Every structure is written in structure tokens, then in C-alpha cells.
Amino acid sequence: TLNISRANGSQREQYDQVEQYVALGYDAVCVNLVDRTNASSMVDLAQSEEVPLVFFNREPVREDILRGDHVYYVGTDARETARMQGEAVLQSYAASAEKMDKNGDGILQYVMLEGEMGHQDTILRSDYVLQTIEDGGVKLQKLDAETADWMRSRADAIMEQWIAEMGDEIELVLCNNDDMALGAAD
């Protein structure tokens, strides 16, 4: 049996749902945490009944994952994907700096489309892509950043607004995921 529940942003409601599934003897419980820093009580509950607990999308803090023998996280490595994006920018810049640096000031003026506000992947992807580019010797200047909540349609609307406001001042568009990048390109 597969049951899907929504916590509607409530950590308490989410805990109650996990508690119910553990009490019903489910083979495993998968959780998209409301608050990634507050998983320990769920881990302890599942551990006490030896029910595997699989977290996805929001990675619990490391200490919570290590609390149990059957606690897992499934997701991307946000740092690595950000480094890869930064390295792609560096490769493009090395191949054609004059095309990217439209105004020739030696600084890439950028805008960034970010995922969900406060989401660890948003924070890590934003920080690590910038760090990778700057560590690669390219100077950056932020023109603007907006939350598009991982959505292509929102990214498209934000990008249209930026183009209307800033036009050719934008030399680089950074996005926290592929869907928002597609929206920016639309």
C-alpha cells in the first residue's frame, strides 16, 4: 500500500503522519521534510520500531541521518551541481570572454533565478556557483536575484521583467535548476 500525505507546512502534522505510518507497520516511510533541522524526533520514532526512514528533497542535518541504522537521504549534491554550473561558465568565459563581457569592464554582470526561499539547495547552489566562478578568476557583479520556486513559468516571467528593465546590462543568467534555466531561455 502506498499512502501519500501532505503536511501543509506543519512540522507537527508531519510528525503525526510519520507516527501513524510507523504505528501501522509500514515497510518504510518517505519524508519531504517541512524543516530539515527538525528530523530527530522522526528518526528516533522510526528507529524505535526499526522502520526505514527515507528523506528526499530536503536533506536533514548530518547528525540526524547518523542517528539511525535505517535512515537515508535521496537527493542531489547541491554543492557539486553548483560547481559544475560554475565550471561551465568558466569554460565559456575562457573560450569567449569578449562575447560574455559585453561592456568590456572585466566584470560579468549577472542575475540569478533562485529556487525555494530558505531551501538548503537554493542556498548551496547560489553560494557555490558564485564561489566557483570567482575562484576561477572571473569577477562578478550582481544585478538582481529573484525566487522562482523551481518553476519554469515563474522564471520566464521574471526574465521578461529583467530584460525589460536591464536589457543588455545582463551578461550572465544563473539558475538554481534546469527548469528555471529553460524558463529564462523561453
Segments the model singles out, each with a brief description of its role:
Residues 1-186:
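A residue-level marker of the well-folded mature domains of exported/periplasmic proteins
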